[in-house]
Structure formats: C-alpha cells, structure tokens
C-alpha cells in the first residue's frame, strides 16, 4: 500500500508552490520562514505545515507583499491575509492552493468549505472554469513530476464529480425547440470523465437535451441510439495519448459510423491535433483542443 505523502523535499515545495528552491532556501536563512527537519548537511525534510505556509506566502508574495513583512506574520495571519486577497482578486490562486492542501490531507470538509464560500459569490460554471480547471491543470503537473499518488488525484476528482452531479440534478427540465440530442461519451480506453460530465451540465443548463453515456463505449453500443433519436450530435473527448496510426484508425471507423447515420461529431482533446487536419475527417468531425473552445461557451 502506498504511504500517503506527508513530508517533502525542497524540490517538492518548488513544484507545488511555484517558488524556486534557491529562493526558498534564501528565505529560510534570512527570515527563518520555514522550519524543516535537517536529515544531513544538505538535505532537509519539510512538513505539511511548511507546505501550507509556503502556499500562502506564495500567494501574498505574488500579490506584491514583501517577504520581510510576511516572515513576521503568524501562520494564522498568513492564512487569513491570503484568504482576503482571494476575495478581492478573482485571479488569485488561494482557492487552488487550499484545495491542493485539502487533497494532500484527504480533507473533504475543507473541500466543501471552499465550495460553499465560492458559491456565495459565483455560479458553479464560473467556479469550475476559474478554480477547478486550474486545479486539475496543476494536479496534472504534480502527477507528471511524481509529487502525488493516484489516491490523491482520485480523491479530489471524485469530490469535483460529486459537485457536478449535484448541480446537474438541480437544473430544471426545459422544453427546447431544438430537436437535436447531444450524446456524450468516452471511447474505449478513455476513463477521464470529469470534463465530459461538466460539459453535460453546461449543455443542460443551456436547455439542450443530452444523453450522457460515460466511458469505454464501443461503436456497436452507439448504433443503438441511432434507432432511438432522429437527430444526434455526438461529443467525445480524448486525454490518453495514442500512436498516430491508432488515432487515424479510430477516426476512419468513426467517420464511417457517422456517415451511416448522417450525423456529425465534436471531438475534444489536444491529443488529436496532429490528425485533425485531414479532409476525410473534417466532413463529419469538428476538432477542439479544449472544452473552453467549444461554441457553447461563446
């Protein structure tokens, strides 16, 4: 079983906070900013408390506060000042940092606290775009640098998914004159459903009729829907990297499927960028690198 990460090297702090390791070391020596445990002459081990403090310091430092002043504040004062900055500036990453810390400590209550505070000043769609997307982007970096375990990513992703489902359920049914049914699915091999779930929420919020299928859906299953609905707009997303040959094989098969039903599709995912220019695909498929590029958000 993987041990939950509760201690960090200075390289971990650099990755998580965006503050260079050299700068962190200078702040330690000059201002006694952090209190690491010294393992030997050159290696220091930092605690979760050190991480939380540095995350708050990084927010305030990036907002113009002098490190000499910040070093004089208590941990509680740093936390409260960073929180106030977040309320004054939508661009502040205070909430992202708070959620990263909640992820490390598996603190669902802290996640809900941030959600409830944000809900007082913005809608869920704005919250997702301004907080959850930057959070997941940052988590992607942490994953690539081996700074987090799968348990961390699964924990925070499932909390966000829970909020998407909650907000989707609260949308009142709207009778739309548009007969198009938007069918959202993940192809076989794709398991990252968070973005697609959010898109389903956004479509419903805009009065669109949707069918959300989730992940691992083969073409044979999709054909069943053609017998149920006369007008379908298919939407799928890709995150998992594939070879060029695998991408083209999927798209050729997909285009044949779309032609049979005289339908079209939107595909979201930067991984398809290298093959998206082929004329054979453009007739039936429109490609987007990210969900934010979709026409629903114009």
Language-model regions: role of each:
Residues 16, 20-25, 29-172:
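Long amphipathic alpha-helical segments
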Residues 11, 44, 86, 185-187, ...:
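Short, contiguous strand/loop micro-motifs
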Residues 3-23:
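Polyanion-binding surface elements
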Residues 1-5, 57-58:
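Short, amphipathic alpha-helical "recognition" segments used to contact nucleic acids or chromatin
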Residues 2-4, 34-37, 78-79, 177-180, ...:
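A short alpha-helix capping/helix-coil boundary motif
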Residues 147-149, 155-298:
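C-terminal regulatory/effector modules of DNA-binding transcriptional regulators
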């Amino acid at each position: 079983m993987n041990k939950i990460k509760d201690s960090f090297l200075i390289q971990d702090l650099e990755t998580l906070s965006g503050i260079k390791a050299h700068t962190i070391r200078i702040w330690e020596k000059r201002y006694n900013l952090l209190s690491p445990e010294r393992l030997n002459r050159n290696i220091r081990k930092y605690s979760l408390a050190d991480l939380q403090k540095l995350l708050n310091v990084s927010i305030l430092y990036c907002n113009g506060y002098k490190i000499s002043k910040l070093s004089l504040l208590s941990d509680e004062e740093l936390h409260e000042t960073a929180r106030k900055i977040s309320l004054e500036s939508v661009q502040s990453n205070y909430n992202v940092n708070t959620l990263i810390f909640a992820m490390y400590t598996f603190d669902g209550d802290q996640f809900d606290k941030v959600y409830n505070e944000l809900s007082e000043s913005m809608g869920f769609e704005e919250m997702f775009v301004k907080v959850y997307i930057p959070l997941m982007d940052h988590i992607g970096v942490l994953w690539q640098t081996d700074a987090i375990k799968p348990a961390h990513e699964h924990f925070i992703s499932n909390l966000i998914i829970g909020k998407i489902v909650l907000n989707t359920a609260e949308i009142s049914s709207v009778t739309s004159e548009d007969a198009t049914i938007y069918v959202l699915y993940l192809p076989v091999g794709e398991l990252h459903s968070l973005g697609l779930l959010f898109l389903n929420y956004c479509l419903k919020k805009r009065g669109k009729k949707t069918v959300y299928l989730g992940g691992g859906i083969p073409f044979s299953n999709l054909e069943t829907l053609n017998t149920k609905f006369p007008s379908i707009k298919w939407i799928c997303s890709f995150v998992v990297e594939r070879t060029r040959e695998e991408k083209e094989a999927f798209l050729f098969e997909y285009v044949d499927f779309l032609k049979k039903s005289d339908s079209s599709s939107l595909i979201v995912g930067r991984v398809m960028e290298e093959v998206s220019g082929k004329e054979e695909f453009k007739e039936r498929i429109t490609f987007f690198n990210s969900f934010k590029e979709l026409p629903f958000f114009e």
